[in-house]
Amino acid sequence: MPKVIEAVYENGVFKPLQKVDLKEGEKVKVELKESVVESVAGILKVSDEKVKKALEMIEYGEDIY
C-alpha cells in the first residue's frame, strides 16, 4: 500500500522525518513534489516569504486583503 512520508534531503541522502517500517537495504520509489509555497510563488512572481505569510493568515482566519 502506498504511503506518503515527509523527508529532508541532506548531504545527498533523503532522511525520513518519522519512523518508517522498512528493512535495511529495502528499495522504495520516491516521488518529488513542489510545496504549495514554491509552486504558487513561481506562478505569482512573489517571494516565498510573502506566500508563506498569506497562507498563515488564511489558516488563522485573518483577512489577507
Curated annotation (Swiss-Prot):
Lineage: Archaea, Methanobacteriati, Methanobacteriota, Archaeoglobi, Archaeoglobales
Biological function: Possibly the antitoxin component of a type II toxin-antitoxin (TA) system. Its cognate toxin is VapC7 (Potential).
Keywords linked to the UniProt accession: Toxin-antitoxin system
Family to which the UniProt record says this protein belongs: Belongs to the UPF0165 family.
SUPFAM superfamilies: AF2212/PG0164-like
Gene name as annotated: vapB7
Name of the protein: Putative antitoxin VapB7
Disulfide bonds: none
